[in-house]
A protein has these predicted regions:
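Charge-rich, low-complexity N-terminal segments
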Residues: 1-42, 47-108
Length: 108
């Protein structure tokens, strides 16, 4: 399953960069893909550079472009079913930066 998740992460990231022309999509990095065991659905975790408004606009644009991204997966990945994609904002990078800042500010 991890191999499929990693391949899908690369395919989706490449498709976002090259195939999508929606102006609402900002600077996006696909950080992880979590595919269900039956391969019918996949959660795509993305980080977006910008404020919350830009994040929301990017997530909405990605959700509306899921058909193109699923077509890219169908072309590149040989699996029985192409999973339905759901996009989520990955807060782990933001949390890590916040912890790092707190540690730097800690006078000990």
């Amino acid at each position: 399953m991890r191999r499929i998740d990693e391949v899908m992460r690369k395919v989706i990231g490449s498709a976002i960069a090259s195939d999508l022309e929606d102006p609402r999509i900002g600077f996006v990095t696909v950080t992880a893909v979590d595919t269900s065991p039956d391969l019918r659905s996949a959660r795509v975790y993305v980080s977006v550079l910008g404020d919350e408004e830009e994040r929301e606009a990017t997530l909405a644009a990605l959700a509306s472009s899921h058909g193109k991204l699923q077509a890219a997966i169908a072309r590149e990945v040989r699996i029985k079913h192409t999973p339905t994609l759901t996009f989520r904002y990955d807060e782990s990078l933001e949390r890590a930066m916040r912890v790092s800042r707190l540690l730097e500010d800690d006078p000990e």
